[in-house]
Amino acid sequence: MVDKNIYIIQGEINIVVGAIKRNARWSTHTPLDEERDPLLHSFGHLKEVLNSITELSEIEPNVFLRPFLEVIRSEDTTGPITGLALTSVNKFLSYALIDPTHEGTAEGMENMADAVTHARFVGTDPASDEVVLMKILQVLRTLLLTPVGAHLTNESVCEIMQSCFRICFEMRLSELLRKSAEHTLVDMVQLLFTRLPQFKEEPKNYVGTNMKKLKMRAGGMSDSSKWKKQKRSPRPPRHMTKVTPGSELPTPNGTTLSSNLTGGMPFIDVPTPISSASSEAASAVVSPSTDSGLEFSSQTTSKEDLTDLEQPGSPGYSTATEPGSSELGVPEQPDLQQEGTHVEKSQSASVESIPEVLEECTSPADHSDSASVHDMDYVNPRGVRFTQSSQKEGTALVPYGLPCIRELFRFLISLTNPHDRHNSEVMIHMGLHLLTVALESAPVAQCQTLLGLIKDEMCRHLFQLLSIERLNLYAASLRVCFLLFESMREHLKFQMEMYIKKLMEIITVENPKMPYEMKEMALEAIVQLWRIPSFVTELYINYDCDYYCSNLFEELTKLLSKNAFPVSGQLYTTHLLSLDALLTVIDSTEAHCQAKVLNSLTQQEKKETARPSCEIVDGTREASNTERTASDGKAVGMASDIPGLHLPGGGRLPPEHGKSGCSDLEEAVDSGADKKFARKPPRFSCLLPDPRELIEIKNKKKLLITGTEQFNQKPKKGIQFLQEKGLLTIPMDNTEVAQWLRENPRLDKKMIGEFVSDRKNIDLLESFVSTFSFQGLRLDEALRLYLEAFRLPGEAPVIQRLLEAFTERWMNCNGSPFANSDACFSLAYAVIMLNTDQHNHNVRKQNAPMTLEEFRKNLKGVNGGKDFEQDILEDMYHAIKNEEIVMPEEQTGLVRENYVWNVLLHRGATPEGIFLRVPTASYDLDLFTMTWGPTIAALSYVFDKSLEETIIQKAISGFRKCAMISAHYGLSDVFDNLIISLCKFTALSSESIENLPSVFGSNPKAHIAAKTVFHLAHRHGDILREGWKNIMEAMLQLFRAQLLPKAMIEVEDFVDPNGKISLQREETPSNRGESTVLSFVSWLTLSGPEQSSVRGPSTENQEAKRVALECIKQCDPEKMITESKFLQLESLQELMKALVSVTPDEETYDEEDAAFCLEMLLRIVLENRDRVGCVWQTVRDHLYHLCVQAQDFCFLVERAVVGLLRLAIRLLRREEISAQVLLSLRILLLMKPSVLSRVSHQVAYGLHELLKTNAANIHSGDDWATLFTLLECIGSGVKPPAALQATARADAPDAGAQSDSELPSYHQNDVSLDRGYTSDSEVYTDHGRPGKIHRSATDADVVNSGWLVVGKDDVDNSKPGPSRPGPSPLINQYSLTVGLDLGPHDTKSLLKCVESLSFIVRDAAHITPDNFELCVKTLRIFVEASLNGGCKSQEKRGKSHKYDSKGNRFKKKSKEGSMLRRPRTSSQHASRGGQSDDDEDEGVPASYHTVSLQVSQDLLDLMHTLHTRAASIYSSWAEEQRHLETGGQKIEADSRTLWAHCWCPLLQGIACLCCDARRQVRMQALTYLQRALLVHDLQKLDALEWESCFNKVLFPLLTKLLENISPADVGGMEETRMRASTLLSKVFLQHLSPLLSLSTFAALWLTILDFMDKYMHAGSSDLLSEAIPESLKNMLLVMDTAEIFHSADARGGGPSALWEITWERIDCFLPHLRDELFKQTVIQDPMPMEPQGQKPLASAHLTSAAGDTRTPGHPPPPEIPSELGACDFEKPESPRAASSSSPGSPVASSPSRLSPTPDGPPPLAQPPLILQPLASPLQVGVPPMTLPIILNPALIEATSPVPLLATPRPTDPIPTSEVN
């Protein structure tokens, strides 16, 4: 079956042949002509061949292509026919009729390329001719882009490209055709550069020998002069040949010559070499002024988004990054070896030498167009070779490779040179466009030959283009620059520095001519660069951290920040672009932080094991490495990607290489061909230096810059400075200094010259010269290098010194090519003179420049008498003539530019030029530290000024990311700054309170700011420090404006029935008349704010407030408190400080604000109760300040007190803090009594709550002392212990100024100062007990923490030490009252305190020997306070002066609008918080009496309970102590202890209530007393204790009852007195036996008789006067029966002295009793009575009491003699004298002996002074009795009962009930 392709070819033959025949020439043709015509003949031959085969592959491609190619080459064919032949060829290529694997394919391709690029045809008209040209383009494109195109040679490819360029740049052609050519070129360039990774680098010698043929010339593609000569032919239309552009002119004879694409110039098809000079002369720029009539195409084609670089059409990127893929399978070509060329390994990096463009080789290598293309080997794209068997002479055709690409690249670069006059704008633009395509398509940097071009010419041209104001060229060059620095910045360190500096210059320049668009594009370019991963980090590492580079990153950051702030206030694109650039750093850093947070620990561990110890840097294109790196911010780069790790021959290190550390990596690099330096910058210790090292380098750099500046002024000074700073050694090391002089580009070359040429520095000059390497350099080249390092001074001796050093060095490096050193010196000098002669303008003006001959002549015979080699002199002459040795900093313009550029290239070739590529996320912290300030400032500005939603969101996103980063790295200062900035935008700080809801509610930006602030504080509160103040200020504003949620303004309260009160007072009508009047007046005057409040808020305002409330709800401010438990301690402490700072420290303050902050503080403390120990000090100091410093009651004080108690209630359960918490309750005792009394309600209720919930957690006596003292002060108005008050007052003036650590601390000895009072419990104390330490361990701890120490003894000195010095005034120890001065008290508070006591007492677990006495004392104080229904308190309350608030330290703000802010008064705050005196007085009568009655009854019950339980409590504790053998003070449970500490005080308390004015209370108390005295436990008491019972309980009771306690209830009082006297006699008789053993029995008995006397005359009724004698009879009879009156000494039992004294006393008031009872005179025979005398006693009890006896008032008694109690009593409770005892208390003096008197005074002469009879003459003759000083203790009012105990007599038949 015949191949279909054969038919296709036959069809094309027919079309072309038909066209030829139809042409005019064939109109009258004959077969003979057809035979003779070579074109038709070849077609006929081809037909025969095709007919003889069945498969097309049987013939070579050349066979069927040749006829068509001949038509294309033929000069005689017309355009249409040529076009048909081109179409056919294109079809063959498109249909793949040419087999790429066929051995003749290469030859065929070469022929085709040659024919099409040299196509000739007879022109018809311009339009038709352009069609042919279009088809030529089409064929060329298809040819290169189809697979068979790979067989084309380098020369063919160059010719193809050249043809396309010619059409592209021919301005006479239509724009459509030129654009088509441009698109064709784009496709071709893309293909060639896409294939770049497949080509191998050619050895330099091969490149040199072959380059000549491939020169493509830049510049104009046609000679413009020829255009002008072309004329239209005047021939008739049939013969007229429209000349195609570049066609030759018609000859006069009418024959048409060929139209050649070369434009009539030997451009491609002429093999003779063209010198550069002639080619330049032959090509002129085609400008718009030519008669082509065409305009420039100013349209730019490079507007694609630069982010789309990674297109699938650029496989070079992905393949190049795979290990081992640097050479993709093209093997070394054998034909090159056959030619004798040696394939060398290409060098890994040509950074050591200046990258020079390879020179053109001048060796002629003719290459004929018609070379035999049949004889060649074919190598297909995969490298498979097809060798023809019959190979003929001639060279083999080599497929194209790197040479043509390099030549194309060089040509494209030359097109971009703006200083080349031949390059039009169109050409420059085209060059840029194609370079863009090339860079987008291939990893050009991997090709060293191309890299050299990029480093030098390409970068230079691009930077020059940045100064051109043609925006399309400017934009295109920016685009190319981006591609360069994105992909190969590691090779272009100093180029990039220059580029960025140029961009910065464009952005900052204030030139009005500079278009805004240029600035915008420059900024856009920077932003694009900054978005490249790691780019910013690399800027920082390679420039900021390089001693001799600019601080690019720092300067750019400053520039961008400054540029983000609009001067006019209006935001433009440039401002937003600047912000974008700054945010790129933030964005990338934040993304890395997120990645670190998200990565699990296991992944980190895996990476740690796999990561090399010295990180390897990723040097591939960053765009292909977009995925984020490892969580620790370091990436594992491939060894192949490190600059310099491309080993010779394109090989790579094996993967395991480079993992053992920096040294291995460097060794691997050193093992390559270039061993001059490692690929690590010498300033770093490792490829990834740590941040500390970078900081050191930065600091060193600053010093170096300073040193450089000083050197440039005065070299010695600069060197000295650097030596002082340790950067240069002392003494000066010449080598080190010389190296510095060479390295530092900032040094003034003139100063270097002066310094090294100084004759003092001869050694330095040697070292300096030795830094140059002159090997292999001609003398003038070496001298050029030498003289560019410094400026040659003008003095001859100095020049001589410098040149001598130079020549010596040069000869050392190059041997001795000259006769001697003088010859060398002379030649060097001659070169300098020649340079001056040729290039110095002044010299040129005077003389003509020196010629070569003159130069030679001058040096004749200088070389040791001989001449120098003439060739060398000629070379030197031309080198100097053509290129001046530039004296640094002397030249300007292009010369200077060239010099600067050469210096840049030189620096790039040294180790200084190493550019370090770093992994993403390295040094994020360093960068963020440098950028956060400018970025936050810029964000704030943009946020403030912008109205666009997107920009606002971008700014907020920036804020959030900054916050996240600062949180990640723990940068508090950054986060604080951020919060403070954001708080300004919430509109909460600036607005007045009245407007705040409406302003805030209607400001969406403020909403966003507020939500952001709160969100960030919730999320990253851990690192917030100073910012808390701003947040709290915002919270306060919300509070003032009533925008906070209800939960935040409702706080716990003890008194309120709901348990909560609101901190915000509701707006209620004022509750006082005058206030109403004021409101009315203000309404009348229509003062602004009031007016609006009267009218009511508008709808808009209401809506705004609703929105504001909704926004605040979303902010969730309460979360700040509830989640404070998760804050780090430091942040928590700062938060608390911020809250504490809103304190009445200043002269003015706002009470509600302070209360709100206090409540937040307390809630935070409670939230943090798990670690409350850390913050307790702060909150305690704050509460101390609020409570103790308050001079008058206010709401804030009340909240502080409630807060303290709330804390105590919640925190007491925590063992570690409970002691400190209880100690802190003493703050309440330090308060001013007047203030404390005003908060008594709250304290009473709070203490009740505390005891109910936490009594079990209170263990130590000290703590109980605090609580009981508090209960006493609150419940009964007792003034707090004076020592505390004294210390509090002493602190008052300066306490406000104290910091946390400065609170007054008191030392041990301070506490034991002489207080001038006796604490209540001291009275109960056994004075013989050894002293104890006055302070608990807790106190000692607190001293250390700087807190005011209050020892237990100061609060309640229950256990006094013996060390108190000095005498003290006496107080009456024998009184029923506790002897305290009770202030006014609040009834409800007392009731609550009694409830609290009741709770403690009724739960047996809470009462222990530690707190028993305290409890009893408190009960007694309450008894005294509730006595007579608290009348004493009411009297005092009425008299107590009202405290004047003028002296109040805390003054409220009298700020404008404060009245408006609080038109609200709170009924609850006023009535319950303030409890004014008026309220209290009015409120008392209504409910007080029932309440007080209840109180008294409760107290009685409690005392009785304690009395009955005392023995069991003490004994059980004593037993437990013995069992556990615990240390500490021993608990005694004997009767003496119990009496002294328990029973006696309790009996005194009950007895006290027996003296109540209320009958019900008195009677109940008497009943309780009777029960108590007869209780079983008391029977164990001995005589002394019973005596004490009389002295301390019964006698004081009887004395008190003599007073007119209840004038209204006369009968009741009579009954009370009768019951009391009966109780006296009953107790006396019951315990008569033990009492008889007392030595003081007589005194006791006489005192009883005194009371009998008084009581008989006390009432007005007969009740007592009848009952008393009966009782007395009973007692006398019992005593007589017991033979008490019988003298033991007298024989026969005569009457004793007691008998005499008794009757002396009785006779005073009952003179006839003796006769009634003892009618017989003999005492021995007593009256017949029962021995115990019970019955009369009983009858005495049953006597009814009636009548009203009133006791007259007693005059004040005399003072007790000081010796009476000095040894017995402790210091008095208060500084009052003993004479302040209650009136009516008789006082007795104590005579040393009793002297009876025979006659007594009249019965009622002095009834109150009972002691009068004792001193009567009755006592004369009575033997002296050993009485102690307490002869008549009942007459002394005292506060300290003495215990009494006794065992009941079993014979006593009287049940207790009888007493009732």
Curated annotation (Swiss-Prot):
Polar residues biased stretches: 250-262, 290-301, 335-351, 1298-1311, 1465-1474
Biased composition (Basic and acidic residues): 620-631, 1433-1447
Gene Ontology terms for molecular function: guanyl-nucleotide exchange factor activity; phosphatidylinositol-3,4,5-trisphosphate binding; phosphatidylinositol-3,5-bisphosphate binding
Chain spans, region DCB: 1-211
Modified residues (Phosphoserine): S350, S353, S663, S1299, S1319, S1321, S1336, S1476, S1774, S1785
Keywords tagged on the record: Charcot-Marie-Tooth disease, Cytoplasm, Disease variant, Golgi apparatus, Guanine-nucleotide releasing factor, Host-virus interaction, Lipid droplet, Lipid-binding, Membrane, Neurodegeneration, Neuropathy, Phosphoprotein, Protein transport, Transport
Keyword Transport annotated: yes
Effect of substituting C983Y: In CMT2GG; uncertain significance
Region listing for Disordered, in residue ranges: 215-266, 281-372, 620-666, 1285-1336, 1351-1371, 1431-1484, 1726-1809
Record-annotated membrane-spanning stretches: none
Gene3D superfamilies noted in UniProt: 1.10.220.20, Arf Nucleotide-binding Site Opener,domain 2 (1.10.1000.11)
Location of the region described as Phosphatidylinositol-phosphate binding in the Swiss-Prot/TrEMBL record: 887-1371
Cellular localization per UniProt: Golgi apparatus, cis-Golgi network; Endoplasmic reticulum-Golgi intermediate compartment; Golgi apparatus, trans-Golgi network; Golgi apparatus
Pfam entry (one): Sec7
Post-translational modification: AMPK-mediated phosphorylation at Thr-1338 is induced by 2-deoxyglucose (2-DG) and AICA ribonucleotide, and occurs during mitosis leading to membrane disassociation and inactivation of ARF1 during mitosis.
Gene Ontology annotations for the cellular component aspect, listed alphabetically: cell leading edge; cis-Golgi network; cytosol; endoplasmic reticulum lumen; endoplasmic reticulum-Golgi intermediate compartment; Golgi apparatus; Golgi membrane; Golgi stack
Biased composition (Low complexity): 1285-1297, 1775-1792
Annotated membrane topology: Peripheral membrane protein
One Gene Ontology biological process: regulation of ARF protein signal transduction
Domain SEC7: 693-883
Tissues/organs with expression: Ubiquitous.
Domain notes: The DCB (dimerization and cyclophilin-binding) and HUS (homology upstream of Sec7) domains are necessary for dimerization. The DCB domain is proposed to support constitutive homodimerization; the HUS domain interacts with the DCB domain which may occur intramolecular or intermolecular.
Record disease entry: Charcot-Marie-Tooth disease, axonal, type 2GG: An axonal form of Charcot-Marie-Tooth disease, a disorder of the peripheral nervous system, characterized by progressive weakness and atrophy, initially of the peroneal muscles and later of the distal muscles of the arms. Charcot-Marie-Tooth disease is classified in two main groups on the basis of electrophysiologic properties and histopathology: primary peripheral demyelinating neuropathies (designated CMT1 when they are dominantly inherited) and primary peripheral axonal neuropathies (CMT2).
Function as written in the Swiss-Prot or TrEMBL entry: Guanine-nucleotide exchange factor (GEF) for members of the Arf family of small GTPases involved in trafficking in the early secretory pathway; its GEF activity initiates the coating of nascent vesicles via the localized generation of activated ARFs through replacement of GDP with GTP. Recruitment to cis-Golgi membranes requires membrane association of Arf-GDP and can be regulated by ARF1, ARF3, ARF4 and ARF5.
Name of the protein this chain belongs to: Golgi-specific brefeldin A-resistance guanine nucleotide exchange factor 1
Organism in which the protein naturally occurs: Homo sapiens (Human)
Gene responsible for this protein: GBF1
